[in-house]
Amino acid sequence: MPLPPLSSRTLLLLLLLLLRGVWIAISSPPAGLGPQPAFRTFVASDWGLTHLVVHEQTGEVYVGAVNRIYKLSGNLTLLRAHVTGPVEDNEKCYPPPSVQSCPHGLGSTDNVNKLLLLDYAANRLLACGSASQGICQFLRLDDLFKLGEPHHRKEHYLSSVREAGSMAGVLIAGPPGQGQAKLFVGTPIDGKSEYFPTLSSRRLMANEEDADMFGFVYQDEFVSSQLKIPSDTLSKFPAFDIYYVYSFRSEQFVYYLTLQLDTQLTSPDAAGEHFFTSKIVRLCVNDPKFYSYVEFPIGCEQAGVEYRLVQDAYLSRPGQALAKQLGLAEDEEVLFTVFAQGQKNRVKPPKESALCLFTLRAIKEKIKERIQSCYRGEGKLSLPWLLNKELGCINSPLQIDDDFCGQDFNQPLGGTVTIEGTPLFVDKEDGLTAVAAYDYQGRTVVFAGTRSGRIRKILVDLANPSGRPALAYESVVAQEGNPILRDLVLSPNRQYLYAMTEKQVTQVPVESCVQYTSCELCLGSRDPHCGWCVLHSICSRQDACERAEEPQRFASDLLQCVQLTVQPRNVSVTMSQVPLVLQAWNVPDLSAGVNCSFEDFTETESILEDGRIHCHSPSAREVAPITQGQGDQRVVKLYLKSKETGKKFASVDFVFYNCSVHQSCLACVNGSFPCHWCKYRHVCTNNAADCAFLEGRVNMSEDCPQILPSTHIYVPVGVVKPITLAARNLPQPQSGQRGYECLFHIPGSPARVTALRFNSSSLQCQNSSYSYEGNDVSDLPVNLSVVWNGNFVIDNPQNIQAHLYKCPALRQSCGLCLKADPRFECGWCVAERRCSLRHHCPADSPASWMHAHHGSSRCTDPKILKLSPETGPRQGGTRLTITGENLGLRFEDVRLGVHVGKVLCSPVESEYISAEQIVCEIGDASTLRAHDALVEVCVRDCSLHYRALSPKRFTFVTPTFYRVSPSRGPLSGGTWIGIEGSHLNAGSDVAVSIGGRPCSFSWRNSREIRCLTPPGHTPGSAPIVININRAQLSNPEVKYNYTEDPTILRIDPEWSINSGGTLLTVTGTNLATVREPRIRAKYGGIERENSCMVYNDTTMVCRAPSIDNPKRSPPELGERPDEIGFIMDNVRTLLVLNSSSFLYYPDPVLEPLSPTGLLELKPSSPLILKGRNLLPPAPGNSRLNYTVLIGSTPCILTVSETQLLCEAPNLTGQHKVTVRAGGFEFSPGMLQVYSDSLLTLPAIVGIGGGGGLLLLVIVAVLIAYKRKSRDADRTLKRLQLQMDNLESRVALECKEAFAELQTDIHELTSDLDGAGIPFLDYRTYAMRVLFPGIEDHPVLKEMEVQANVEKSLTLFGQLLTKKHFLLTFIRTLEAQRSFSMRDRGNVASLIMTALQGEMEYATGVLKQLLSDLIEKNLESKNHPKLLLRRTESVAEKMLTNWFTFLLYKFLKECAGEPLFMLYCAIKQQMEKGPIDAITGEARYSLSEDKLIRQQIDYKTLTLNCVNPEHENAPEVPVKGLNCDTVTQVKEKLLDAVYKGVPYSQRPKAGDMDLEWRQGRMARIILQDEDVTTKIDNDWKRLNTLAHYQVTDGSSVALVPKQTSAYNISNSSTFTKSLSRYESMLRTASSPDSLRSRTPMITPDLESGTKLWHLVKNHDHLDQREGDRGSKMVSEIYLTRLLATKGTLQKFVDDLFETIFSTAHRGSALPLAIKYMFDFLDEQADKHQIHDSDVRHTWKSNCLPLRFWVNVIKNPQFVFDIHKNSITDACLSVVAQTFMDSCSTSEHKLGKDSPSNKLLYAKDIPNYKSWVERYYADIAKMPAISDQDMSAYLAEQSRLHLSQFNSMSALHEIYSYIAKYKDEILVALEKDEQARRQRLRSKLEQVVDTMALSS
């Protein structure tokens, strides 16, 4: 059979297929496709769907949802529903409330299904949810009966994460007969690594209630079948998690595709941008210890774009063709994977996505190569999220094959190179979300779900000639606008695909062949399922086509489509039964017979002969109805119809043509068909014989009768004249036929004129006149027809027209008349001053009628009617437009005839309009003195009749400008500016330039020019230049400032609703440079804008634009708009903000108030409006602001997720209810409020009587109360008077004392600048805080050790720098009972000294310990406020030490000075009054316990002390008291003489004698005890100055101590008693330099006498409490506390203000404080502690109570000073006040409260406010970056590197290793991380070496 001739249509289809970009998406069916059939669906109206599985045998569908599990038939009919929630739960409850009561409030919690697996062997469904910490249910497959729900062990809790698509599992059936199955499950853990492993292998028992259900497959004390995310990883990257996207088993391996935070790209800073990476994870099925764990980065790349965010995957076998192309066996597996572009936005990834292909062979090969290289010892483990990622691979001789499953080393292992897939298909518009694939008859078909709810069908063909590896041949809608979720599953028979969105499951057929209605469309679709079933004329699968295996009955290639031709291809409608011959190609055996069918009109029999088909056309009678009303032809389909199937299976176009419809000769003979024109009959026919006269038959257009174009026909109205026409082939009318006529189709009055045929080529319309109505048209073109024999129209192919014209119409002036078309015979009649024909004008003289033909014609009396513009610059260049009459007929008439005053104005020829308009350019008028002038036009010459002057004068002006507004704008330009000045509308043309670039002109008036700024070159000022014609304007004082373009940093909140209108706070830079910024959003192809209000350069508030779209609306969980951005003048970069994650949520939906629309309500009853979407699930704290109006009155609102509770205003009557939120407004109906019903008369009487009685009782009570209160008032007034007197006395005393103290303090500190304060050096300061009471600590000394010991200690030091070892060491020590509080503090201090040079590392350890401590505190159900309150852990003491190290600089520069001033002030004030040397009590005190409670008489003496260093130097005056003991006087003298000298560098009072000099020779040594000492009844009183009768002004000296006779005799007893007391002090607390040695002088215990000084101490030893003898017990002396407090108030305030302030005289807040406070806030956030009191308390316990209180109570830790007991007592009161100020609890005070609390009761609220402000200010400060903190800590380490001997510190720490060696080694052995780092063996090495050396 010959090859068919390819029709043009077939060729076109082939060409399209070759050129087709195989990446197309068919969005709507093209012509020839049937409509998309409705798919079967299951709709879940209430709960969101999450997972779907299909039973491989029954085909039943199981769907997991929120709070539900559904069982559906294969056709999606609901069979069963099982309820799983909501449940009463709280995510914080671990274990769940069903197991153990929970302290957290429970609420109704949704249970989100996260895992749905079929257990075929046990005939059950495994469904795991999010509630109760992630427990699972087992459901019977038949009826979803709950078989079990294990929930009582920790193994039963998989994860409480609520995200549905983040968990994946593989169920591994047990060996046949054994029954035990395994579940491999991977899940994110949301930071709860202590509760949940991220990956685990669990037992699945046959009995659902078995206690071992979900137990780890293997577990011992060291390893188990699980993998946890290390807490260190989570502390560094709190957002780290692993999300499991897809899992599968292949051979003996289980694989997971995961998404996890990319720790290499993501900054640990929580505020930074998060990057994610996709990993493929592999485990051996039979590896219970997870030694085989390997993970590799996975992704693919296309055209330089990386796709790294895995969305879904599907394991499949390749089709035969694909397997061959990949070089695989057909039973090998491939993985189809969908990735989104980039590495950001895991939750809402970019729309651009790619479908990629991986072979499992390549994946296994990559993994094997990595394992082999590691076992060769190459590289590191490189698992970024495990601590041992830097651990090197260990060389091992093991043979690694494909089935290798790991050892206990070199694991877990991470891949370093990304496994790259083959990109098949890229979707840039819609975003792929799900994938499934299968092999159909050797072809690989992939189905991809999209974000818009479509299913793309893709054919994979790597050998495609176009070079594209995949063809998207069809796209069908599953559910418009809703993303397809991951579980895209094929039915068991592979006929259907189940696609799931959040609310619907759709059964999508894998093919829709039937939609294609032709072979070309069917096979052109490239759907591999579809072929053309020829004789059935249907597109179908091959198996659906009857006898498809027979030759040419089923076409599977476009070239196999049936081709059909017919001869002849057309017949006339008048012809009947014309024989037709049809030739067909690609047809099967037609022996069963065929018919010819002309569409559905008629059918004829056919005969098959010689491979051809013979049939006849229909009869003329049958054709008539087919062609009626169809014009000159009707194309019909001629079909071959099979007698076997009764179907039409091939077609060809066939034409019936109709000549008779043509009414003109040219139309007849120029057609496509063989028609003839009979010119004498004036008809068109297909039959030549129909023409009566042979010569009348026309076949060619040249022979047709027709009018030819000649000269134009101009006919003046009202003039009689003939019209001659040229023609061709004009027929001679035959006998009986009428002659020719001309038809003029004049509107309103058509004219028919007899015509005379001269010959076949000439015709004349006879004499006639013509007219038309009206004078508003000067000439009228009129259609002209020539007819003969009444209505036979001669063809007029050129549409020749006649022009009728009237001379006077619209030509009122001479100029207009003469400029008319010269072919009109119009001229100007001078006498009558009108336009007329020549013969209508009286002919007085030849010049009485002028015509344009006369070359010398010109009109008289030119006139100027208008000038534009009327002003211009003197520099000239203004184009002046002069409008008028008779302004010359030709340009030459006016070329030199226009002047403005004396200035020539040169006409522009191109803009000259004859007689009407002259445009001329004014010359330079700079020399012209006049300010204005008349415009003169002369036509040829300036004689009187040819000269015109303007009615207005033209003014010459000098334009200027003086202001531009706005004066600044963005560098990109686009700002509308107004330039203000004068005469700015002068001239004809204006051009503005800014910085040399044109400013786009808009409009101007005399005072302003508006233009749009161009882009600037650089930021800064740019000059403005205005060119008005030739005048150039500039003003150096007016400049336009270009600023940097505005930027947008943040939109808050980042969401709105469908209707927009919500307020958005936009922060950025340079925002105020744009006057009217607008915000824009594009959604679903529709763009809308809204306005913004700028507040300053960094803030503006915008109303969100609406995105209301009839075709699309955002889902409940929100959706990003296609674009969001800002219109900021011409700043293009802000039009689309790519970085914004702005979301739109649907509008609220409110229910009507009632079915009738009217709700009746009682007054004061709340109005409840129910609805949904009321609170969009947006992140952050922002909420939708509602306004509810009752009528026009707003009501008070309470908003919840499903209702608005409105406290209705006090209204009655009927009112409309309106709800507004942003741009959303809705009225749910009308509200009818009824007033309360009136009371009845008996009720009113009863109420009145009762009220009267009640009134009488109240009056009686009031009278009694009045009397009682009058007595109380008298008593109160009396007490008030007494208190006022007391207060005024105390105030006076305070005032005097403060003034005196200020003077003394000034004297003391006048020479104390910063350098004068005796600060201790860093080392001494640190030692006193770290090791209080130990003067000579080993860490200060060099240690002499053997070389091997030094080596061991060095190794031990390296171990301490391994975080895991150090943490294990500390935790193990703390777990020992014998490890005391003292030990804890000592270890903390030793560790900090050892790590002084590694402060960054020490900080990391401290943070981890604190994090653990917080966890422990919260787990043990302690109140969170107790955290850090005491020093019960190493961490707490380490924290104190950490602040000690890092705040030294701050103490020296800022806080030290007010602390030292307070210390000096207290010491000075105490020493102004008597101080008892024995009891330590004083007249002036802040402490009630140290207050002398009796009157002591004393005098102040001034002693003149000889300077002990320089005898000849002036004496130093020193104030003392006559009641002071000798030692007290010595102390005061030493303070005065050695003022400014550090205490440690001056003599001690005990080493000096006091010498009283009375004249040159008389010198008396004064002592506390000597022979003159008075003894009374066993009481011995110390000697005082009064005892020695020392007078005021006496001269004294301090001399080195001498031994007198008395001293020798008495020193033994006194020294014994003193030394005993001092040794008691030493053991109790502190070193010699720290002890409060004076004034405490110890009684002589052994001699039996009791010492006293000012008051006898009855509490001494054996005396009872309270028997105080002579002491007055009255509390009256407590007012002295108040006086002392008032005196010292300023110094306390100064200290507190310095400590609680963030700005200190140029010094910044120490980084350590900000860093630690931020850390505590992070911990609170992590544990969801939102109680501000708890956060406040943590900070107070951390810094003020742990560091500052210690420093305030012990200033000797910071300064080289001596602190006596009374100063110590006063500082303790200040420290207690400091502690109370930091507390959040209210102190309820009463008369029994301690005096020190009452003393500062009024001040504490003020101090508290300082503390709160301090904490708030710190919180507002920008976070410290890790880099800044690292640099700071490194600098601190460098500064103090060699302060302590680290070897000694290590030796001290090692003593604890030695003590608890076994426990530490066991702990290291148990810990998996420690085992991996081989820490135990390293420690054993240290222990062994140290043991040998000892």
Curated annotation (Swiss-Prot):
The keyword Transmembrane applies. It is a single-pass type I membrane protein. Residues 1262-1315 form a coiled coil. This is Plexin-A1. Residues 862-957, 959-1043, 1046-1145, 1148-1234 form the IPT/TIG domain. Gene3D superfamilies: GTPase Activation - p120gap, domain 1, Immunoglobulins, YVTN repeat-like/Quinoprotein amine dehydrogenase. GO terms for biological process: dichotomous subdivision of terminal units involved in salivary gland branching; gonadotrophin-releasing hormone neuronal migration to the hypothalamus; neuron projection extension; neuron projection guidance; olfactory nerve formation; regulation of smooth muscle cell migration; semaphorin-plexin signaling pathway; T cell activation via T cell receptor contact with antigen bound to MHC molecule on antigen presenting cell. GO terms for molecular function: semaphorin receptor activity. Coreceptor for SEMA3A, SEMA3C, SEMA3F and SEMA6D. Necessary for signaling by class 3 semaphorins and subsequent remodeling of the cytoskeleton. Plays a role in axon guidance, invasive growth and cell migration. Class 3 semaphorins bind to a complex composed of a neuropilin and a plexin. The plexin modulates the affinity of the complex for specific semaphorins, and its cytoplasmic domain is required for the activation of down-stream signaling events in the cytoplasm. It comes from Mus musculus (Mouse). Glycans are attached at N75, N658, N670, N699, N1041, N1185, N1210. Pfam families: Plexin_cytopl, Plexin_RBD, PSI, PSI_PlexinA-B, Sema, TIG, TIG_2, TIG_plexin. Residues 1264-1894 are cytoplasmic. Belongs to the plexin family. Ubiquitous. It comes from the Eukaryota. Disulfide bonds join C93-C102, C128-C136, C284-C405, C300-C356, C374-C393, C513-C530, C519-C561, C522-C539, C533-C545, C596-C615. Keywords: Cell membrane, Coiled coil, Disulfide bond, Glycoprotein, Membrane, Repeat, Signal, Transmembrane, Transmembrane helix. Its main location: membrane. It is found in: Cell membrane. Disruption phenotype: Mutants are born with the expected Medelian rations and are fertile. Mutants develope osteopetrosis. Dendritic cells poorly stimulate T-cells. GO terms for cellular component: cytosol; glutamatergic synapse; membrane; nucleoplasm; plasma membrane; semaphorin receptor complex; synapse. The gene is Plxna1. Residues 28-1242 are extracellular. Residues 28-510 form the Sema domain. InterPro entries: Ig-like_fold (IPR013783), Ig_E-set (IPR014756), IPT_dom (IPR002909), Plexin (IPR031148), Plexin-A1_Sema (IPR042744), Plexin_cytoplasmic_RasGAP_dom (IPR013548), Plexin_RBD (IPR046800), Plexin_repeat (IPR002165). Residues 1-27 form the signal peptide.
